[in-house]
Amino acid sequence: MNAYAYTACLGIYGSTPNNEQLVLGSPDQLQRNKPRFRLIVLPHAPAASPFYPPWRSFAPDWEGQGARPMDHFKVGNLRFQLETHRIDEHSTFGKLFGHAPSPSQSCVSFQKKSDRAEPLLLARCSAASWSCIHPPTVLYFVAYQLEYPFAARFSATKISPIQDKMVATSDVPIVGSLYVYAPNKGAPIFFTIAFAISTILHSWQCHRYKAWKLIWLQPACAALFTLGYALREYGAYNYLYDGTEKAPLALFILSQICIYLGPPLLELANYHILGRVFHYVPYAAPFNPGRVTAFFGGLMAIVEGLSGSGVSLTANAKAKESTKKTGHNLLLVALALQVCVIFIFVYLSVLFHRRCIKAKVPAQSKAVKSTLMTLYLSMALIFIRCVFRLVEMATSSTSVDITSMERLMKLSPVLRNEAYFYAFEASLMLINSFLWNVQHPGPHLPGDTHIYLAQDGTEVEGEGDGSEDRPLLLNMANTLMFGLLYRDDKDHTHSQPQELYENPNGNGHKKFRLGNGGRAT
């Protein structure tokens, strides 16, 4: 076994911490304990000292070293990542130490087994940000496992569970992280499995109720989210980007695109369902039901184009600053437009709902009421998500530059803390997906636009718009192209037929076709 032994010399002004030896003797030990191995250091030394900020490397034989600032370093099989926290007497760490630490000649060095001192580069930051010690900065060095075999020994301050919890919940970014922070490793697994289950349920329900033409976008979006969070799980272990490896960056961009494009497509699915509800009660529709998908779809086409372009520009760590700002602005415009479209949807839905009540649509309109309430809840979830994204974008004073701690600290706390993402993005979209599993429109709405609800409560098969005569894939393509392939402009103002006969439909509904003068027996 290749063994390395390093000693960390720690000093904090006004305190005498109890140091304990932490021995990492196997990969399992490191894997189990690595989140707790942190060294708390106050960086300050006389100007004449080689440790004077910005600290530099004097060990060119070790990987990643050279006469330049860095945010991390590697020694043997260990990787040390720098995180910084500014503190004062009111902060978490000021309260922890009882006061704001004063300047001291505290520094940290690592020694090889030969006891020959080798000062290592510890921080990447500007000289200006480190030349003033008021307020001071606390550094955390976290040991990461790189490869086997290894053994290491540290002399470090013992961290209490309270301290460790404080550090773990911090929103301080990590330099070099594609996500800005260190992504949670368990959450993507949960959401990948949950969205996969929803995808399977949607697919089964579409087959069971013959509702592929009605709601096929729901299983498609759930599958898109499944892929996005599966790739995010890969990114949770490969989030540090140094500009050399292409795979982490490419998969990160693909993951972001999948997660960002899902909600606008879910909106499009809701607009398509609203159009089908208008077909079902055409005399209460605010305008021609056949134009709903084309109208909302045209607006969502713009949103999708802006979102896709914006994500691809902002997620690319190699892009220029001007390019990232352009992507940032495109996303802001897309989100603002998305919110406007939601307001238009709500207005038309409420207007339609009031017309149904005024027309005293009979008891069979339970299908309409149930579907409308589900649409309202779904759009509320998407609206909250849009507001979250707008706040995230609008409160960030700069585009993401993962190489600069100063730029990262200017980002919105909403962007720097992963908890907000899972609360207002992932969770809301998962709830929306399962909402349509529970309140699937298949059992309530007829499977084609030929069927509508007459004012006496019977379901009547009228002329229709011809869309059900097209192949399934052609209908899907029309929806995916935002209703622009076919424009169903036929008049849908049906008259009340006098004689009908019953014909069972595949999804459990009863069709009533116009008879030739005789009543069905």
UniProtKB/Swiss-Prot annotation:
It is found in: Membrane. Induction: Expression is positively regulated by the phomenoic acid biosynthesis cluster-specific transcription regulator C6TF. Residues 493-521 are annotated as: Disordered. It is a multi-pass membrane protein. The chain crosses the membrane at residues 186-206, 211-231, 249-269, 292-312, 332-352, 371-391, 418-438. It comes from the Eukaryota. Keywords: Membrane, Transmembrane, Transmembrane helix. GO terms for cellular component: membrane. PANTHER family: DOMAIN PROTEIN, PUTATIVE (AFU_ORTHOLOGUE AFUA_3G00480)-RELATED, PROTEIN RTA1-RELATED. Belongs to the lipid-translocating exporter (LTE) (TC 9.A.26.1) family. Lipid-translocating exporter-like protein; part of the gene cluster that mediates the biosynthesis of phomenoic acid, a long chain aliphatic carboxylic acid that does not appear to be essential for pathogenicity but may play a role in allowing to outcompete other fungi in the environmental niche via its antifungal properties. This is Lipid-translocating exporter-like protein RTA1. The lineage of its organism: Eukaryota, Fungi, Dikarya, Ascomycota, Pezizomycotina.
